[in-house]
Amino acid sequence: MPSADSVFDYVVVGAGPAGCLLANRLSADPSCRVLLLEAGGRDNYPWIHIPVGYLYCIGNPRTDWCFKTEAQPGLGGRALGYPRGKVLGGCSSINGMIYMRGQAADYDRWAEQGNDGWAWKDVLPLFKASESHFAGASEHHGGDGEWRVERQRYSWPILDAFRDAAEQSGIDKVDDFNTGDNQGCGYFQVNQRSGVRWNASKAFLRPIKDRPNLTVLTGVQVDQVLLNNTRARAVKAFWQGAWHEFAARREIILCAGAVGSPCILQRSGIGPRQLLESLGIGVRHDMPGVGGNLQDHLQLRLIYQIRNSRTLNQMANSLWGKMGMGLRYLYDRSGPLAMAPSQLGAFVRSSPEQATANLQYHVQPLSLERFGEPLHTFPAFTASVCNLRPASRGRIDIRSSDMNSTPLIDPNYLSDSQDLRVAADAIRLTRRIVQAPALAAFDPKEYLPGPALQTEEELFEAAGKIGTTIFHPVGTCRMGNGELDVVDNQLRVHGIPGLRVADASIMPQITSGNTCSPTLMIAEKAAQLILKGAATQTYLNEDAIPTP
C-alpha cells in the first residue's frame, strides 16, 4: 500500500476504459512503477455483469457520478441526467456494450486538421491490437486482444421486421459496422463474453492483478495536478479520509473522461483565466479551451405501439415473464437478460448531400416514458435516432475550487439550426421506415412524439421534447494546435511538460457512433507514444519526489 510520499513512474487518473488499458500497457515493463487511481469502487456489483443490469447501474450512486446538465433551452428547458461511470471500468461498466469504431472519415478528418498519426490507416491497427473478435483475426479485426467482441445471444421478431423495413426503404443490410464505412442496417456486435458484460476492468486489469509494479487504488478522488514551475510533478488526492500526494517521476496521464479531465485541469489552475480568477484559483496556465468544445449525441426516442408480437414490455411486467427470463439466463446466459439495451442498429444519411451516414439508429424491443421509469405495459418498440455529427457545442466547467461541487454541464443541445433540420429529417425518415410493408403485420402506431406533428416547426418542437443524451460526451480537452486546443497530437497538454490527457475529451470532433471503443483506441495510441518517448528520455522528474 502506497504511503503519502509514494513516487511512481506513471500516475494514471481514472480507471475507465482508457485508464484500464493504459495501466495495462505501461505496467508491461516491470521496471516501471504504475499507479492507477479510481474515484469509484470495485466492479463487484452484480448488476454490472448482467447485460440488462445497466438499468440498475445508470442513476445509481454506487456506479454512476449522477451528474445533471443545466436546463437546456433547446429541450424546452429540461435538465437531463448525465450518466458517467464511477467504478472500476468506468462507463464500460454501465454502458450499452456496443462495439463501434465510427467511420474512417472521422479519423481522416482529425488528421486533415493537423493531427498527424490519427488517420484511419494509423488507428485501425490500434483498434485491432486490443480486440478479441469472435470470428478471429482478419483485415478489419483483431483476434488476440483483450477486448472481447461477440454476436448477441437473443433476437426478436419485431427487430427482424424493422431490419426488413429498413431494407425496403433503401437501407442495405450489413453484418459488420466496423470496417470504416458503417452505412446500413444490422445487429450490433457487443462487448460480452458468453452472455456476461465484458468491461475494461475484466479485460485489462484482472489478468495483470499480480504485477508487483502496478498499484490500483479505488475510492481516490483526485483534486488537482501539482506543478513544479510548469512541469507536472504529482496529483493531490483525497483517499481513506486524508489528503495525499502521489508523485510521478515520468508522467501524469488524465483518463478521467470528458467531464472529469477538464475539471481536474481547471482546479489545477490550467484553464480559462476569467473562470479561474472568478473562483479564486491561481492561474498556472491560461488555456481558454479547457472545458469547451463539448459534443454529445442527442437521441430522439420515437416509440411505436404494436400488435401481434411480444416485446420486453410484457415480459418485464409479468411475474412469469420475469421468472422465465431469470431461469433462462441462469441456464445458459441467454434470453432477454443477456441482451444489450439496443440490439439492432442502422447508419443512414439524412439527406443526399451528406458524404457519409450522419444518423444512427438504436432499435429496442421495449419502451418507457423516460429513463429511470418502468417499462410500458403495452407492447412497443423504440426507434432511437441520433445526429452523429452535431454542430452544437457546449461547455463543462467547475463551479468552485471544491472538488466535491458538481460541475456545470451545458451541452447546448439543438442550439444550432443545422441540428434542428437534421432532427426533423430523422423523424420523417423513421416514419417512412415504419410505414414499410415489412412492419404492416405489427400495425405500428406512433406513441411518441405523435403523428399529428407534421410541419417543420412542429418537428423542431418535438425534437426538443423527446431528445435526451445517449451518453457520449467528448471534446472538452480538444487535440490540435490552435488557440483553443488543449493537447497536441502526442496528447501532451500544451505548455505543461509531464502531463497528458488520454480519453474521449481529446476528440476534435465526435466519432460517428458509440464512443467507448474509440476511447480505448486513444489509450492504445497514448501508450505507444508514452513508451516511445520513455525509450529515448533520459530526464526523470526528480522534483516529483516530495520534500520531507
Where are the regions that the model predicts?
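FAD-dependent oxidoreductase catalytic-site/capping-region signature
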Residues: 2-8, 124, 130-179, 186-188, ...
